[in-house]
């Protein structure tokens, strides 16, 4: 062992306890190239650096394209554009209050339209009830004291079918708009291809109840007019 080697080995021992030891990056020799472990580490570090650079480039390109696509709002009094107050995908309380303030007229209008529709439906049902009551009261008695209605068979059948079809159509429309997939067209209760795949059964109970409502309405009107 030479004095130079002993001096190199004893140099770290002569450092003070509080002095940080500089760590040099290991340099790989020519013999570590090829299929060795050193080349894998170098290639992995270079690959990570390349991935980081690609991610930075994508983020910068995405942010710049978003700024170009987003419309700039009207400038404020000082000339600076007003941007939406949104941080981390969440609007602030002021922005939420403004959205609610803009939305309440639409909600009030929808409530008024619903009330108007309910009033019109009630008026239509009241008029229908009065007509049915008058037709049921105007019966004639023949010589054998048997009540004979003014309506014939075909008139009674047409009125009953019209009432049943109207009730069935209304229930069908309500079920269609209230279903979990209102975009499915046509709204049929029998759709084994798609409905069975989604729910496990091929018959929609809501549509069957709509058909049952129409049948019951037709029978009720026919019984009242007889």
Swiss-Prot record:
Domain of life of the native organism: Eukaryota
Region Disordered: start-end pairs: 1-26, 62-81
Membrane topology: Multi-pass membrane protein
Chain ranges passing through the membrane: 111-131, 150-170, 205-225
Listed InterPro entries: ARL6IP6
Pfam families (alphabetical): ARL6IP6
Modified residue annotations for Phosphoserine: 2, 36, 60, 65, 80
GO cellular component: nuclear inner membrane
Keywords for the protein's UniProt record, in alphabetical order: Membrane, Nucleus, Phosphoprotein, Transmembrane, Transmembrane helix
Localization annotation: Nucleus inner membrane
Stored PANTHER family: ADP-RIBOSYLATION FACTOR-LIKE PROTEIN 6-INTERACTING PROTEIN 6
Family: Belongs to the ARL6IP6 family.
Name listed for the protein in its UniProt record: ADP-ribosylation factor-like protein 6-interacting protein 6
